[in-house]
Amino acid sequence: MAAVVVMTGCSVMAPQYSASIDNVQKLKDSGDYSAKVGAFTSKPGQGNVNPISLRGSSMNSPYQSSYAKYVEEAIKQELSLANKMAPNANAEVSGTLLKNDLDSSGFSTGTGDIEARFVVKKQGQILYDQVKSAHHEWPSSFAGAVAIPRAIQEYPNLVQKLLASLYADPAFLSALK
């Protein structure tokens, strides 16, 4: 099946986000607060294309065909699982996706890079505005039939790393309280 997808150069869907247990635990351990998730947008530009090109195939987001919505959904899942999500919370997390790319062209290694600006507001006042980024590498192959499915499979791990860097920032967690 993967070989057929690769050879036809068609469009594939990124896997739905699966929350990181470590990220959820970090949110649980970060104190008493609740937050809601606002809109995430995407700033078009080099290194932030939609869909993502993978050796002639293209990968789309399962969330309204938007990778900004992918990051938004990821934060919603992790806040919900940590019992920190509340639709009427004062603190609102929103953001802008600045960079989002996978490279499956390497002979033995695939890479991914993602960068986003995260904003926390309370009653219209910005309490946090920072750019976070993540880089992820995985074993790959020269053979497209191996490299492309592997890159697709690794995308959620890239987003998990981005959110881990956000949750590791004490200023972000403090802004939520």
Can you describe what each PLM-predicted range is?
Residues 51-64, 125-168:
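Short secondary-structure boundary motifs at beta->alpha junctions and helix caps
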Residues 62-88, 95:
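Mid-chain, structured segments of secreted extracytoplasmic proteins
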Residues 42-44, 114-119, 154-159:
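Short alpha-helical linear motifs
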Residues 11-22, 81-129, 133-149:
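Surface-exposed short loop/turn segments
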Residues 76, 80-84, 102, 163-171:
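Sec-exported extracytoplasmic/periplasmic mature domains
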